[in-house]
C-alpha cells in the first residue's frame, strides 16, 4: 500500500512538466515601446512615471509639514510600489 508521501511524489512526477512551461511563458513578446524610431523597454516608462508620482507625493508631504523617519526607505518603497502599480495597470 503506497504511503501518502509516495502518492504525493507520483503526483509531482505527473505534473512536473508544467513548471518549465510557466517559466518560459513570459518570453513570448518583448515589452518594448517604439518612441521616435527607437525601442525602449516598458519598465523604463514605468520607472519614469513612478519617479514623477513619487516626486508629487514628496511635494504633498512637504506642504503638509509631515516629518517622516527613514525618508530614503520610504521614498524608495513608494517608487517601487508606484512602478509595480503602473506595470500592473498598463502592461
From Swiss-Prot:
A lipid is attached at residue 27 (S-diacylglycerol cysteine). It is found in: Cell membrane; Membrane. It comes from the Bacteria. It is a lipid-anchor; Multi-pass membrane protein. The chain crosses the membrane at residues 33-53, 70-90. A lipid is attached at residue 27 (N-palmitoyl cysteine). Residues 1-26 form the signal peptide. InterPro entries: YtcA (IPR031381). GO terms for cellular component: plasma membrane. Pfam families: Ytca. Keywords: Cell membrane, Lipoprotein, Membrane, Palmitate, Signal, Transmembrane, Transmembrane helix. Belongs to the YtcA family. This is Uncharacterized protein YtcA. The gene is ytcA.
